[in-house]
């Protein structure tokens, strides 16, 4: 499936990952076994944490979100909610997503969520994510899904 296309490679990546055999569980995080992103008006995506696998299963349109390459439900080990300004680009409803200026967000993994801050050094640079102690976050090894959440819809995201 698509997840296999982007498996860990021997190259410099955009993220910092935990060392082999190390699991990241945010100490002071809020419970995030279910994360609903009601800010998306069409597909209403959400994630459900599977404690057995340590992964989040993704859903949308009221059902499992399935990878068309292998017919398996999409899963991820880490979710990053990146809060961004998203003004209308034109009269057709297209959004001009600001993925450059930096902002706040959430890092979600292993049933927990913590507040983060994100920034970029340049328009084409790598996005860096920092915890409340200004340390760049380390992700659990595996798949990471980044969701852009419009600044004016942050309150529509729920955690259970």
Predicted segments, located by residue:
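A surface/extracellular/periplasmic glyco- and lipid-processing/surface-interacting theme
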Residues: 4-160
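Extracellular calcium-associated, cysteine-rich motifs in secreted modular proteins
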Residues: 1
